[in-house]
């Protein structure tokens, strides 16, 4: 009896689902299923670059809420809050073999960096970051201890900058390690600094060693190539 009832529920839900698809989905003639890489006349993403691609993907989107002061187009979005302040929201995605190489990047350092690159966007808008969400896609080649190391770096960054971990998501991945972090900050609306606010003769101040990170990257890449060619040189 129970199995028959369960089958009926599944059958009925499937009917509702198919009906919904037929009423709300485009017709098959409107759906193009193709492998883009095999088709002539398509534009490669590299031909546009990051910002032109973002403009193209988002040009049809509108703002439906008056509390959204600034959406796409700056370091972070700006949203009014009930207390007269604004929340500043930014997100970044880090993908293995694109943004980092685990052959020379320690997981703890990667966790720390993944937080910092998001907090920097909030700070660039002259807001004070107070929270982050962390979403991780991880393949089965990573043991629990590896994730412990990753989150140790995330925890270190949260401690250093007094930022709360607000939540996130964890899922499996077939392409290695993927990290997505959203950072949220707060400021007075009149204190927000936009990219468009830069003026001629403004003073630009920087800290640290300009080009130091890139120089270090070149050294690490050189050493990685050497070890691939001569694995016997790998240190104990």
Predicted feature locations:
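Serine residues within intrinsically disordered or low-complexity segments
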Residues: 20-27
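Helix-biased detector of long, well-ordered alpha-helical tracts
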Residues: 16, 30-236
């Amino acid at each position: 009896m129970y199995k028959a009832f369960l089958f009926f529920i599944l059958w009925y839900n499937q009917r509702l689902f198919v009906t919904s698809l037929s009423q709300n989905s485009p017709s098959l003639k409107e759906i193009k299923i193709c492998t883009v890489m095999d088709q002539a006349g398509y534009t490669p993403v590299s031909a546009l670059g990051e910002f032109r691609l973002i403009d193209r993907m988002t040009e049809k989107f509108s703002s439906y809420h008056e509390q959204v002061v600034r959406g796409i187009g700056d370091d972070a979005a700006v949203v009014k809050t009930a207390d007269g302040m604004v929340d500043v929201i930014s997100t970044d995605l880090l993908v293995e073999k694109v943004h980092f190489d685990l052959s020379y990047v320690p997981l703890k350092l990667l966790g720390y960096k993944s937080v910092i690159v998001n907090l920097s966007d909030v700070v660039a808008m002259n807001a004070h970051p107070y929270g982050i969400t962390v979403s991780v896609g991880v393949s089965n080649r990573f043991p629990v201890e590896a994730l412990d190391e990753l989150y140790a770096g995330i925890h270190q960054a949260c401690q250093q900058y007094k930022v709360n971990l607000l939540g996130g998501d964890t899922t499996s991945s077939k392409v290695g390690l993927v990290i997505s972090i959203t950072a949220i900050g707060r400021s007075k609306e009149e204190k927000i600094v936009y990219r468009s606010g830069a003026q001629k003769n403004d003073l630009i101040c920087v800290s640290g060693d300009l080009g130091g990170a890139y120089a270090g990257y070149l050294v690490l890449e050189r050493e990685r190539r050497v070890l691939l060619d001569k694995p016997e040189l790998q240190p104990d």
